[in-house]
Amino acid sequence: MDFSQLGGLLDGMKKEFSQLEEKNKDTIHTSKSGGGMVSVSFNGVGELVDLQIDDSLLEDKEAMQIYLMSALNDGYKAVEENRKNLAFNMLGNLGNFAKL
């Protein structure tokens, strides 16, 4: 193993990770609940970027809370799953390390 190439490999991975993070920011994950009465959208870094609530729910606070929690939880899970997949893809590239 040639440790002199390790720095270059790490720099390359850091650059690739930054590019993936930037690209991931543009990815949108949308979750709906209550048959579409509530819709939330997160970008790939977990920021809530859109929230839609059907007007009919404005008079039913309890239902709105339940649907909001459900949609938010599903959206959060989608973002986390996407992050995990990106991390596994990055780790897959560590196979290049063994070739050094």
Curated annotation (Swiss-Prot):
Taxonomic classification: Bacteria, Pseudomonadati, Campylobacterota, Epsilonproteobacteria, Campylobacterales
Biological function: Binds to DNA and alters its conformation. May be involved in regulation of gene expression, nucleoid organization and DNA protection.
Which GO molecular function annotations are given, in alphabetical order? DNA binding
What GO CC terms are in its UniProt record? bacterial nucleoid; cytoplasm
Its main localization is cytoplasm
State how it assembles.
Homodimer.
List keywords of the entry alphabetically.
Answer: Cytoplasm, DNA-binding
Indicate what this protein is called per its UniProt record.
Nucleoid-associated protein HPSH_00175
State the source organism's domain of life. Bacteria
Q: Which family does it belong to?
A: Belongs to the YbaB/EbfC family.
What SUPFAM superfamilies does its record include? YbaB-like
